[in-house]
Amino acid sequence: MIDSARRVLATALSAVLLLGTLAGCANGSGTTQNAKSTDGAATSETTASAIKRGESHDPSIVKANGKYYIFGSHRAWLKSDDLINWTPFTNNLSTDYEKIFSGIWDGWAKQSSNPDVKGNMWAPDVMWNKDMKKWCMYMSINGANYRSVIVLLTADDIEGDWTYVGPVVYSGFEKVNAAKTDVWKVLGEGADLTRYASQTDTGINAIDPCVKTDDNGDIWMTFGSWFGGMWMFKLDPKTGLRDYGTTYQTVPNQSDAYYGVKLGGGFGNSGEGSYLLHTNGYWYLFASYGNLQQTGGYQIRMFRSDKITGPYVDEAGNTAVSTRAIGNNWQSDIGIRLMSSIQWSGNDNANIEVAQGHNSALVDDDGTVYLVYHTRFSGTGEKHEVRVHELLPTDDGWLVAAPYEYTGTKAADTKYTSKDVTGDYELVTHEQNTSFKGPKKVNEKNSTDYRGVNKPVSITLNDDGTVGGDKTGTWKLDKSDGTGDVTITLGDVTYHGAFDKLPRDKDGKDVMTFSALGGNVCVWGSQK
């Protein structure tokens, strides 16, 4: 998202969350209204579903000691026993952040246009470092004009307390202030820094870290920002900081001597919140396009590679790395869009998900893969909550998101026959050029006649393998391994995906669904 918009929204969210904390203390039930605690985290339990919701912007998921933990922007910490119900928790970062970050904030990121650290602790990622025998938290400390830094903190317990270690990577530097960073250490004293002011080259914001270990045991950190692309370099496993022994060449659209390997984006195109996941024989790169606001078009795009360093491509072979400016690239066909704003019978259409993004993902102990993201809603302005969907593998090596929220039913729990899945379905296509824009009539605030949402057509999966209805074609259930793998051909596009019987978001009714990918576009089906 645009940096200034993010700062303004962060300030507003902090104020709202603070008020929510006071309100939560006054109401002990937490059932029909938000019961908020901690600065940045909140939960609410709805009477309809009895799910204890969690609020955490830019949620990063990690599992430890049999529990699931989310670490988000603005010190929004959540934990869960089941990936469904979330409880906030606190540590020293919740209250002592000004003292903990005073050195790096005052010495680098603080500026007159951005004087308060409170709304500028963004998108942490947490991992266990087996060499250090510590939990390592990588957090963005955001400054104006891209003068930001990603720092490392460590803890013996994943819930904290946390100890500040030091900076990992800087942005927004120039010759007059480079001595405050590690730039001369990496590039050599007096190196030419001209290209670091260019958004078409390497003028990035050092935000949104993601830290992963590859098959060789090497630790890599991805990071980066909207305009200037997403990058990665190797970390030293003994310190958790940058590995200064590994160097990189400066090659346009491929790598940079300071920022390392280029993974995606650049040339002023949106692309942030990079997240890597290794499963199914591939490395998958997730990135968020668009602006994070309710009507900003925020969305998750996916690419994959055989190697952690890329190159990452989508199903059509488009590279994640931009080589030119693309106006409103969140409306482009580059990258697989996992989900969009939709209206169908399985949703509460007065409050549909919008601006879904900044995800993380988890391969659980049993091999189930989950997508974790924040979403806003059509009827609640900039309020956001965490959502979790299962990610299903396709027979051609991609991942697709299950159509409904994970509430305890796993796709792997049941094998399906043709008799189980034939019937009438609503079919939604996650068009890449659509995004929620509010009611068609702006003055009708409660209208559900929205602009920029995807609506279903009707199809029938017949028992003879044909598809009838608004779209026609053929379908086939793979019975060779007893899984729910499906191939559907509609027109000249063949989709590969999986069936999954799930409770609908709207009312909990169990229905057969499918999620599939073809022609670089995802589709969802939900039985009527």
Locate predicted features.
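Enrichment for repetitive, rod-forming helical segments
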Residues: 13-14, 344
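Bacterial N-terminal signal peptides that target proteins for export
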Residues: 1-12
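Carbohydrate-active catalytic/glycan-binding domains of CAZyme proteins
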Residues: 27-528
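C-terminal motif of bacterial Sec signal peptides marking the signal peptidase cleavage site
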Residues: 20-24
